[in-house]
Regions:
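Pepsin/retropepsin-fold aspartyl endopeptidases
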Residues: 1-82, 87-178
Length: 178
């Protein structure tokens, strides 16, 4: 067999490389799309739009996620965070591994009763927290070492006590309480 016949029987290297690169790009794009779709299932409120009510109050409308929870994007001390509304939490509860990056310092040791029992926590203060145009200052919070696997911050009653809620279907409207 001569060299010419051998070349014709071998798939062109360039075509094979383009095929491999094409499949890598397709798989990468599918992974990216699937990841964003999953994020939207967990937090359908990533792009909040504030509106003004008939009474002239600023309000934010949240869509319930597929698990039945209200999860939203917000800001703590200027940093973007994911918040899970939790009327059973006394304070805003921040995972310990996120606290330093949010500018929170551990103050007094404390304990909190959770669904998993009593846990050691640290009290702290959040200078600024916002959900859309709803803004809150000097908020009582806790730093929870037991939440380090969580990617959401529990938005507890130390903020929620300042909000009026109206739920209709899968939507929860938040506005500042008078």
């Amino acid at each position: 067999m001569n060299n010419l016949e051998q070349k014709n029987n071998t798939p062109p290297l360039l075509s094979r490389n383009f095929l491999i690169i094409g499949w890598v790009v397709v798989i990468g794009l599918l992974t990216l799309v699937a990841g964003r779709w999953e994020e939207r299932q967990i937090n359908p409120n990533q792009q909040l739009v504030s509106q003004v009510s008939a009474e002239g109050k600023s309000e934010v409308v949240l869509q319930r996620n597929r698990y039945g929870h209200y999860v939203t994007s917000g800001l703590i001390n200027g940093q973007e965070v994911t918040l899970l509304l939790d009327t059973g939490a006394t304070y805003v509860s921040v995972p310990e591994n996120m606290a330093e990056g949010l500018g929170l310092r551990k103050m007094a040791r404390s304990q909190s009763s959770t669904a998993n029992g009593v846990v050691d926590t640290y009290l702290t203060r959040i200078e600024y927290l916002s959900i859309g145009d709803l803004e809150f200052y000097d908020i009582a919070a806790s730093i929870n070492p037991g939440m380090n696997h969580d990617t959401s911050i529990l938005l507890g009653m130390s903020v929620l006590k300042n909000i009026e809620f109206t739920q209709r279907g899968d939507q929860l409207t938040l506005r500042l309480a008078p």
